[in-house]
A protein has these predicted regions:
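A short, structured active-site edge motif that brings together acidic residues
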Residues: 30, 114-129
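Short, acidic loop-to-helix structural element flanking the phosphoryl-transfer center
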Residues: 67-95, 102-105, 132
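Structural recognition of alpha->loop->beta junctions
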Residues: 111-121, 181-201
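Conserved phosphate-coupling serine/threonine residues in phosphotransfer and NTP-handling enzymes
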Residues: 2, 97-99
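Conserved H-loop
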Residues: 24, 49, 114-118, 145, ...
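Acidic, Mg2+-coordinating phosphoryl-transfer loop and its flanking beta/alpha structural elements
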Residues: 150-190
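Conserved Lys-Pro-Asp/Glu-containing loop-to-beta segment of HAD-superfamily phosphomonoesterases
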Residues: 131-160
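N-terminal helical cap/lid subdomain that shapes the substrate entry/recognition surface
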Residues: 3-80
Length: 201
């Protein structure tokens, strides 16, 4: 969501599962209003009944659809430029993601972004669990103090992760969560990378 424009694919994927269960499909705007972590809670908001079937069934359907269509995703506008700008200022960059590690490495490689990152850290499951734990490991592995690290994210969860890790955070509203919801975190929220990079550098 921050670097990769995949919100549309997440909406397509969840709608496949909703329609199969005779539940109402959602728009991208609705998605950005309800998407949350843990993702099980987001599914329940949309009407999935986990007394009837385990969460993992719908979750696996979504992951399968996402995986089959993942190659269609593109980078957010300005992603490459912002990575270049940060790198040219001798600031190191790493990825911390709630995406499965193999998906994460695939898309970073597919978009030829490897050279920009010191570390690329995803999770070991397909249900978006464990970002905080992986974040703790990442921060401990980085040769920097907490006050020298900043998270750039697109979800309320990114703000929560930053709070747990005791590091700074700014948010961008072109991803999985609406600007209105992001502003409620109290973080600085930007609508494009140009304004964000001016704030950081």
């Amino acid at each position: 969501g921050t670097l990769l424009d995949d919100t549309w694919l997440c909406v397509e994927g969840i709608n496949q599962a909703l329609i199969k269960r005779k539940l109402a499909p959602i728009s991208e705007a609705k998605y950005r209003e309800v998407f949350t972590f843990p993702v099980r809670d987001y599914y329940m908001k949309l009407g999935f009944d986990f007394d009837k079937e385990p969460f993992e069934i719908a979750g696996d359907e979504f992951v399968a659809y996402y995986g089959e269509n993942f190659h269609k995703t593109k980078l957010q506008n300005g992603s490459r430029s912002v990575l270049k700008a940060i790198q040219s200022n001798s600031i190191s960059q790493s990825i911390l993601s709630a995406a499965r590690q193999d998906f994460l490495l695939d898309w970073v490689s597919a978009h030829k972004l490897d050279k920009y990152f010191l570390k690329i850290v995803g999770i070991d499951n397909q249900y978006a669990k464990g970002k905080i734990e992986q974040g703790i490991k990442l921060v401990n592995d980085l040769p920097y103090n907490e006050e020298d690290i900043i998270i750039i994210g697109d979800t309320v969860h990114d703000s929560d992760v930053a709070e747990k890790l005791k590091i700074n955070c700014v948010l961008i509203d072109h991803g999985h969560v609406s600007g209105e919801r992001l502003k409620k975190t109290g973080r600085k929220v930007f609508s494009n990378f140009k304004d964000l990079i001016t704030h950081i550098l």
